């Protein structure tokens, strides 16, 4: 027997074909959400308060300090928040201290700071009753970046940018004349030496002393001449910078100094964030820049005078590691003192080394490091600016390297906690202005923190973020996998990110650093491709927001691959060589081969085993969760795998789903972490279990009650239904399944079913990927799903009186009220179809002025029907089903309703949808199709043992699409069904062809895994053997019931008066320009005329046509389409004098053209009568003529006789 058994949870064993030992379990799959929010509550929120506070008034006599905060219990439980359309949030109380510096008085007070949305255990938020997710954002990291560009003459120029988290950008660039310029905040450029002089190093000698003598420096110094001898060089530089930043304003050195301090050195205006300081220190640090360079002068220990490194030594990694403590200490540190007129007058500490130029061994190049400022320094320092300039100058000498902005070392993730912190900071900074003004205006003696703090800006910022930010999304709740994928999504869009239109191919493309961090496969098709990604299965965020992936450390001395796990970011990984997870190992953990496949800085090739530093932990660390659920992924083309991963997220939860026979082993973990199942929180024993709740008694005697949700409506209108898995007496451990969620079976993800599938054509019904299906799948409810829709009706106070929910509805027969209760609300369990009343409601309507007598009669007889109109809630067009639940909210019961609303009724209608022609089906390999025919079971082809096939697919759908995984799955699935087992074939480590054939043989199938099929209609065998097996097929959310639509009389667009479009608007079908051409081509003038008039926007024409049809009268001639009037008005609005004239050149009002249509009536009967009349008249005339002729002839004869 190939493979080995693996237990997944307590309910499922699978035969696994994996050969690679898993040394690390998958992390919790939603930790990116939960960990980030926890960090925000633990210290993120505190940091934001500390950033903005303390706040002083303008005279600096009062100061408001932050002391601490406390989050109280949420007002509603999760379930209550859902029912009441409320948010699941907790009140937050902040303690402030107000200090009067003149009197020394201190007032401490706790201030209510609004309700803050709290994340649920599932990583979601409930906002206004709807479950939402904050998608993590992928943004460019703050730091310093260097780039190169080639000009039209082929000359390479360099550029650099310091990008802060917030604040002004500082750029450097060189031109074709080798002069280096700087730009501050995208303004006009100035020579970089001007900025150096403004920083207090004004002499040319000082500049050469700092940067060394290079062509770029020399050219720039020559360009930057002293123009005004009255000013010092520093003052002149300051004024020049001020002129660039504030053109047209009077320039002084003092104002320029304060402007530059505010732009770069004020922590309130300029913030690198922890990550920016980390990236700058990493980039400008001398350790990374000295690597593999030849030192030009000996390195001497400043304390002992000992020579650490001789001149001419190549600084290899081992040499640098040997003097690392000195490099981090005071080695080669030089203190430069700026002059007194400088922007910042503190001494500047730099680390300076001289190395041999890589391009010219006779030249010496100076490398300046920023001497590693402390992590707490969140602004840029003069040392950073000088070190950046040094790196820039070094690039032209061949030292250092330019950055790739798509490298994941330069892109970081802002998860929910950071996005929220930014929002709170925004609100607090708006509040700050307000507080300052109140402190200055009001009397200091009586002021308290409560009086000067207005929390509205903060609560508004948070509310706006959750309600309308691009990153706050309604949770995709089609099935548990789509929930999980949504929580792990990474978006490059959103505020501070990219926009769809400006994102090029490079940003969207797969980058080598995505390996183990972002999935190369799972991304949407369409305009967002590559901008929205998914975290890989083992991906994890470090404290700076960079994605890390785990590797097994290789002991370089012994060559043993240890079980020690090291998490590396993309930057760190670039320094090492990493072997693939499927490299063969010996028993002792050493590599079996001398040469192994590995990666180093994106180069995939064979490397000697003795230079490998790390090894992948698992083959599935490359891909995301949905992709890791595709068996035989390695046999599929990536485009189809992308479709397969995306379509699993669109699977509809079925009534009784089955886990796949052929899985990947990922199904258990995905179901467990998705948040849709009920998981035991503690160890214990089940003491009570039914469909609604499970009670577990813990060992310490306390009781846990788990509530099971039955048929709740999910965000996407599917039934969210949980099923109890445990029985009384079962012992459960923490983390065990207590109940399956939707689309789960026995603790595993179960998106579809395991039908018997044959690859064969049948009467042409599976042309173009169509699917032929057996009636068994309909009859046995194999692909039946339940859908829930919510309808609501509210009564409001109107000017004419309150609306009322009642059973007494004007002009409605008793038959329509049979299922309403005495209040006028539908009963639970009633079957309803479109147009049925769900909630009877009447609204007062405006009265005509009645005479006194009429009013008296009204008052006496209470004739209600004339003063109210029917505004009942009815089942909308195209819907039907059974009433599942009714919820009533009233002010009397203490429910919170919007102002003006007295009562709110919600009706839930459940609809059972069997599979039908037009529904979309798919496998897991991107093989999708539409059901084209449902064939009776007796007509379906059958196997030699008499089993009829369930589904027939077109064999032509496989070769050109190159998703061969489906064929492998088919054969292995048939073997699993025959053997009565479930199989796990993990991605990139699954069943080999030998495993596949040995399992097929074990199941007693034929050696080609094909079989003879018999035609169900004739009983004859088909000519050729057919591939038949079991394939996992899912029903997708694109169902024909949601798409089929027909319009009778419906709404029209206000301006053009043409019918609206789309099913939601009960719209019509668009008869467009090309369709008009078709009718013109055939000369179908009458059809064309009515399509362009009655059926579209001829207002009078269509009214009269409707009237004529209902009364059985002839249809009048059409009038002028409204769109012609719109065109005329539009031309007139452009100032063109356009008028319509008749034959006599008299102007005709457009409205007049429709007048007198009734005279030109065409009536078929009249035509017949007219014809008959004309024929009779013609006949009479003919007879009269004949008679006249006869008379004349007779007269002539008589005359002749008389003669």
From Swiss-Prot:
Q: Which UniProt keywords apply?
A: DNA-directed RNA polymerase, Nucleotidyltransferase, Transcription, Transferase
Q: Per its UniProt record, what InterPro entries does this chain match?
A: DNA-dir_RNA_pol_bsu_ext_1_sf (IPR042107), DNA-dir_RNA_pol_bsu_external_1 (IPR019462), DNA-dir_RNA_pol_su2 (IPR015712), DNA-dir_RNAP_su2_dom (IPR007120), DNA-dir_RNAP_su2_hyb_sf (IPR037033), RNA_pol_bsu_bac (IPR010243), RNA_pol_bsu_CS (IPR007121), RNA_pol_bsu_protrusion (IPR007644)
Listed GO biological process terms: DNA-templated transcription
Region ranges (Disordered): 1174-1203
Q: What does the record give as the reaction this protein catalyses?
A: RNA(n) + a ribonucleoside 5'-triphosphate = RNA(n+1) + diphosphate
Q: What is its EC number?
A: 2.7.7.6
**An example Gene Ontology CC term for this record:** DNA-directed RNA polymerase complex
Enumerate the GO terms in the molecular function aspect.
Answer: DNA binding; DNA-directed RNA polymerase activity; ribonucleoside binding
Q: Where is the sequence biased in composition, kind Basic and acidic residues?
A: 1174-1195
Role of this protein? DNA-dependent RNA polymerase catalyzes the transcription of DNA into RNA using the four ribonucleoside triphosphates as substrates.
Family stated for the protein in its record: Belongs to the RNA polymerase beta chain family.
Subunit and partners = The RNAP catalytic core consists of 2 alpha, 1 beta, 1 beta' and 1 omega subunit. When a sigma factor is associated with the core the holoenzyme is formed, which can initiate transcription.
PANTHER family to which the protein is assigned, alphabetical: DNA-DIRECTED RNA POLYMERASE I SUBUNIT 2 (PTHR20856)
Query: What protein name does the entry list?
Result: DNA-directed RNA polymerase subunit beta
Q: Which organism is it from?
A: Streptococcus pneumoniae serotype 2 (strain D39 / NCTC 7466)
**This protein's encoding gene:** rpoB
């Amino acid at each position: 027997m190939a493979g080995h058994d693996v237990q997944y949870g307590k309910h499922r064993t699978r035969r696994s074909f994996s050969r690679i030992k898993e040394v690390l379990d998958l992390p919790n799959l939603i930790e990116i959400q939960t960990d980030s929010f926890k960090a925000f509550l633990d210290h993120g929120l505190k940091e934001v308060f500390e950033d903005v506070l303390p706040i002083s008034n303008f005279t600096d006599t009062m100061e408001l300090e932050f002391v601490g905060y406390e989050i109280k219990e949420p007002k509603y439980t999760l379930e209550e928040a859902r029912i009441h359309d409320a948010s699941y949030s907790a009140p937050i109380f902040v303690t402030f201290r107000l200090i009067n510096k003149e009197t020394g008085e201190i007032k401490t007070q706790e201030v209510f700071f609004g309700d803050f949305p709290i994340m649920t255990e599932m990583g979601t938020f409930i906002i206004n009753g709807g479950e939402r997710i904050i998608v993590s954002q992928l943004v460019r990291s703050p730091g310093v970046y260097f780039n190169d560009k080639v000009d039209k003459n082929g000359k390479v120029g360099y550029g650099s940018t310091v990008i802060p988290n917030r604040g002004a950008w500082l750029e450097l660039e060189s031109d074709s004349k080798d002069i280096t310029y700087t730009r501050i905040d995208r303004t006009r450029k100035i020579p970089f030496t001007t900025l150096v002089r403004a920083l207090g190093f004004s002499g040319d000698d000082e500049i050469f002393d700092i940067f060394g003598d290079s062509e770029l420096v020399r050219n720039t110094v020559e360009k930057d001449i002293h123009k005004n001898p009255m000013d010092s060089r520093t003052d002149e530089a300051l004024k020049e910078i001020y002129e660039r930043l504030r053109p047209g304003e009077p320039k002084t050195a003092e104002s320029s100094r304060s402007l530059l301090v505010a732009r770069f050195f004020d922590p309130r205006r300029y913030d690198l964030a922890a990550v920016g300081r980390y990236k700058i220190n990493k980039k400008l640090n001398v350790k990374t820049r000295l690597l593999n360079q030849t030192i030009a002068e000996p390195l001497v220990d400043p304390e002992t005078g000992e020579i650490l490194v001789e001149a001419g030594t190549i600084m290899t990694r081992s040499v640098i590691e040997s003097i690392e403590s000195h490099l981090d200490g005071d080695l080669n540190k030089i203190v430069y003192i700026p002059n007194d007129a400088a922007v910042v007058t503190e001494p500047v500490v730099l680390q300076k080394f001289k190395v041999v130029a890589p391009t010219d061994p006779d030249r010496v190049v100076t490398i300046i490091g920023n001497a590693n400022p402390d992590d707490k320094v969140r602004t840029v320092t003069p040392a950073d600016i000088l070190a950046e300039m040094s790196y820039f100058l070094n690039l032209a000498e061949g030292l250092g390297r330019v950055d790739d902005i798509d490298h994941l070392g330069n892109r970081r993730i802002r998860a929910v906690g950071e996005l929220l912190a930014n929002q709170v900071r925004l609100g607090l900074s708006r509040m700050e202005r307000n507080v300052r003004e109140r402190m200055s205006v009001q009397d200091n003696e009586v002021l308290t923190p409560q009086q000067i703090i207005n929390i509205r800006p903060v609560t508004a910022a948070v509310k706006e973020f959750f309600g309308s930010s691009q990153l706050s999304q309604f949770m995709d709740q089609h099935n548990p996998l789509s929930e999980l994928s949504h929580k792990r999504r990474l978006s490059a869009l959103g505020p501070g990110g990219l926009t769809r239109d400006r994102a090029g191919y490079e940003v969207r493309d797969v980058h080598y650093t995505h390996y183990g961090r972002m999935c190369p496969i799972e991304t949407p098709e369409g305009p967002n491709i590559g901008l929205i990604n998914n975290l890989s299965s083992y991906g994890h965020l470090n404290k700076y927001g960079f994605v890390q992936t785990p590797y097994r450390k290789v002991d370089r001395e012994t060559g043993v691959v240890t079980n020690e796990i090291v998490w590396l970011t993309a930057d760190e990984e670039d320094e090492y060589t990493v072997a693939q997870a499927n490299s063969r190992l010996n028993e002792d953990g050493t590599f079996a081969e001398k040469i192994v496949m590995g990666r180093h800085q994106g180069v995939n090739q064979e490397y000697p085993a003795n230079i490998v530093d790390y090894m992948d932990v698992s083959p599935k660390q490359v891909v995301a969760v949905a992709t890791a659920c595709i068996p035989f992924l390695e046999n599929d083309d990536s485009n189809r795998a992308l479709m397969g991963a995306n379509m699993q997220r669109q699977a509809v939860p079925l009534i009784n789903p089955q886990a796949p026979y052929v899985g990947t082993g990922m199904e258990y973990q995905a179901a467990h972490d998705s948040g849709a199942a009920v998981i035991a929180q503690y160890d214990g024993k089940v003491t009570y279990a039914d469909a609604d709740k499970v009670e577990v008694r813990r060992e310490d005697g306390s009781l846990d009650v788990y509530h099971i949700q039955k048929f709740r409506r999910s965000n996407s209108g599917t039934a969210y239904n949980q099923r109890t898995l445990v029985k009384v007496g079962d012992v459960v451990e923490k983390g065990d399944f207590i109940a399956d969620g939707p689309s789960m079976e026995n603790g595993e993800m179960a998106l579809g079913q395991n039908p018997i599938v044959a690859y064969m054509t049948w009467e042409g019904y599976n042309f173009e990927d169509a699917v032929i299906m057996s009636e068994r799948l309909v009859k046995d409810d194999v692909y039946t799903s339940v859908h829930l829709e919510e309808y609501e009706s509210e009564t409001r106070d109107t000017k004419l009186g309150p609306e009322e929910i009642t059973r007494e509805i004007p002009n409605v027969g008793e038959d329509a009220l049979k299922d309403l209760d005495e209040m006028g609300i539908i009963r639970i369990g009633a079957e309803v179809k479109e147009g049925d009343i769900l909630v009877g409601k009447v609204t007062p309507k405006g009265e005509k002025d009645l005479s006194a007598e009429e009013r008296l009669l009204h008052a006496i007889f209470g004739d209600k029907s004339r003063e109210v109109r029917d505004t009942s809630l009815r089942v909308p067009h195209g819907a039907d089903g059974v009433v599942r639940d009714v919820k009533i909210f009233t002010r009397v019961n203490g429910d919170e309703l919007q102002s003006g609303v007295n009562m709110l009724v919600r009706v839930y209608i459940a609809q059972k949808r069997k599979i039908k022609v037009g529904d979309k089906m798919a496998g897991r390999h991107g093989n999708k199709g539409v059901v084209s025919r449902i064939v009776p079971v007796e007509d379906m082809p059958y196997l030699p043992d008499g089993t009829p096939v369930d589904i027939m697919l077109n064999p032509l759908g496989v070769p050109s699409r190159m998703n061969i995984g489906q064929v492998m799955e088919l054969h292995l699935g048939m073997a699993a069904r025959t053997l009565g087992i479930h199989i796990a074939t993990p991605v990139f480590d699954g069943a080999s062809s030998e495993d596949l054939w040995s399992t097929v043989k074990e199941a007693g199938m034929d050696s080609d895994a094909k079989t003879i099929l018999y035609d169900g209609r004739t009983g004859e065998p088909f000519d050729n053997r057919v591939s038949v097996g079991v394939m996992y097929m899912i029903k997708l959310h694109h169902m024909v019931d949601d798409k089929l639509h027909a319009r009778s009389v419906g709404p029209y667009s206000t301006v053009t008066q043409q019918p609206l479009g789309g099913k939601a608007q009960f719209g019509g079908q668009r008869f467009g320009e090309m369709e008009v051409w078709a009718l013109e081509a055939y000369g179908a003038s009458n059809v064309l005329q009515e399509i362009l008039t009655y059926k579209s926007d001829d207002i009078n024409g269509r009214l009269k046509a409707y009237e004529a049809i209902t009364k059985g009268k002839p249809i009048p001639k059409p009038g002028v389409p409204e769109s012609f009037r719109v065109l005329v008005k539009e031309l007139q609005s452009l100032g063109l004098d356009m008028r319509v004239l008749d034959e006599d050149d008299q102007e005709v009002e457009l409205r007049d053209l429709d007048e007198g249509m009734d005279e030109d009536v065409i009536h078929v009967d009249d035509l017949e009568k007219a014809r008959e009349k004309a024929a009779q008249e013609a006949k009479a005339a003919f007879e009269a003529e004949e008679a006249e002729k006869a008379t004349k002839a007779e007269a002539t004869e008589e005359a002749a006789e008389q003669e």
